[in-house]
Regions:
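Flexible, glycine-rich surface segments
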Residues: 202-289
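Alpha-helical transmembrane signal-anchor/signal-peptide segments
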Residues: 27-51
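Secreted/periplasmic serine-hydrolase-like ester/acetyl group-modifying domain
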Residues: 121, 130-236, 321-369
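Short extracytoplasmic
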Residues: 43-69
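N-terminal post-signal-peptidase region of extra-cytosolic proteins
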Residues: 49-56, 97-105, 226
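Membrane-embedded segments
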Residues: 64, 69-152
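Hydrophobic membrane-insertion alpha-helices, especially the h-region
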Residues: 8-26
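C-terminal regions of proteins
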Residues: 258, 263-369
Length: 369
């Protein structure tokens, strides 16, 4: 009798504990997967791969998107209104070409019309092992398959650590995710405000001396190119325009990168499609003012990239930024990149824009709307 009573009490305590954990996880929704109908979400931990795809599928008529942007956290801040099309930002932390293939097929299979795909690439596109990303619960994809998606929901509901994280991170700066508009992530305004308070001090921050380095997986190099070939074939089959661009790298990171491998990748990439390249030595990559750290350019720079790639060219204040690489100029382009890097002086004086110049840049107002 005592043992039965013990097990009954144990079972009840366990059940109540699990019920509390499930309820709290659903309520706090650390990864945003249970409240995808919200149009604006404040979160730094949103699972973009899951939430955005579900959002597009469930709201394809109201969103009316016929154009989509894929890429890593470097494209998350891009305001897709700039494209002049109804474009949805499907960028995700460590977003890779595998995400694009999976999601574009889901959309096509669900009858969503696609006119244009924008694909943002960077060094992590051909460095990082996607299996480590796809197995990370923070980044797991929406599969549009009932059994697999229910399994994901269950994992999120039953994780006590999520409740702990919500408590620990309460009060921290939260970015705004415009899920109901265009999927863009907006950096907390305090971050931009703090930069502008003392620009002279900011550009001398020691963080800009530390390169961003990824673990290299040699398999991913060919895998990334194979993925892009497959995406290109999908686009040709369904009469979709494909626009590829290579994101800028802060010079500290660029100097630490494998130049030979990067140029080899670009020479293979151009066989698949011509592309815009914003990396290399230029006005933006060489000046700390345009960066949050040595990995992510500031939001208004992200907008300029998309403005150029989409062909709108409404943002005109950024000089010497972006080269259109084709099979005809790729060899000369790569050779010049090597020469420019060898000639670059990392100790050059940092350019600091005037207050008037900064006012034009950071307002993000030179748009066609």
């Amino acid at each position: 009798m005592k043992s039965k009573r013990f097990f009954l009490i144990f079972f009840l305590i366990t059940a109540i504990t699990e019920a509390i954990i499930v309820s709290l996880n659903y309520y706090f929704d650390y990864y945003g997967v249970f409240h995808t109908d919200e149009t604006v979400v404040k979160s730094n931990t949103l699972n973009d791969r899951f939430v955005k795809v579900k959002r597009v599928l469930n709201n394809s008529v109201s969103l009316g998107c016929t154009s989509f942007l894929w890429g890593s956290s470097r494209v998350l801040k891009m305001d897709t209104k700039i494209t002049g099309e109804n474009t949805y930002n499907l960028g995700a932390p460590a977003g890779m070409t595998e995400d694009c293939i999976e999601q574009i097929n889901i959309f096509i299979n669900n009858g969503i019309k696609i006119d244009t795909v924008y694909i943002g690439l960077d060094d992590c596109s051909y460095y990082r092992d996607y299996s480590a990303i796809s197995n990370n619960l923070s980044w797991i994809s929406y599969k549009d398959e009932l059994n697999r998606d229910i399994e994901t929901y269950s994992c999120y509901l039953l994780m006590p650590s999520n409740v702990k994280r919500v408590i620990e991170e309460k009060g921290k700066l939260q970015g705004i995710n415009y899920l109901g508009e265009n999927g863009m992530f907006s950096v907390p305004y305090q971050i931009e405000e703090n930069i502008e308070k003392n620009v002279v001090k900011y550009v001398k921050d020691p963080q800009f001396l530390v390169p961003t380095i990824y673990n290299k997986n040699p398999i991913e190099f060919e895998r990334c190119l194979d993925n892009l070939r497959e995406i290109s074939e999908i686009c040709k089959k369904h009469k979709i325009k494909m626009k590829i661009f290579f994101n800028p790298q802060h010079m500290t990171t660029y100097l630490a990168d494998d130049m030979e491998l990067m140029n080899r990748f670009k020479k293979e990439l151009v066989k698949i499609s011509s592309f815009w390249d914003f990396s290399g030595v230029n006005y933006v990559t060489a000046n700390n003012y345009f960066w949050y750290e040595t990995s992510h350019p500031r939001a208004f720079i992200c907008d300029k990239i998309l403005d150029t790639v989409s062909g709108q060219n409404k943002i005109t204040w950024v000089p010497d930024f972006g080269v259109y690489v084709t099979p005809d100029n790729v060899d000369a382009f790569c050779e010049k990149a090597v020469r420019d890097r060898e000639a670059y002086d990392p100790d050059h004086e940092q350019w600091i824009p005037t207050a008037e110049e900064r006012a034009i840049m950071i307002k993000r107002v030179n748009y066609p709307w």
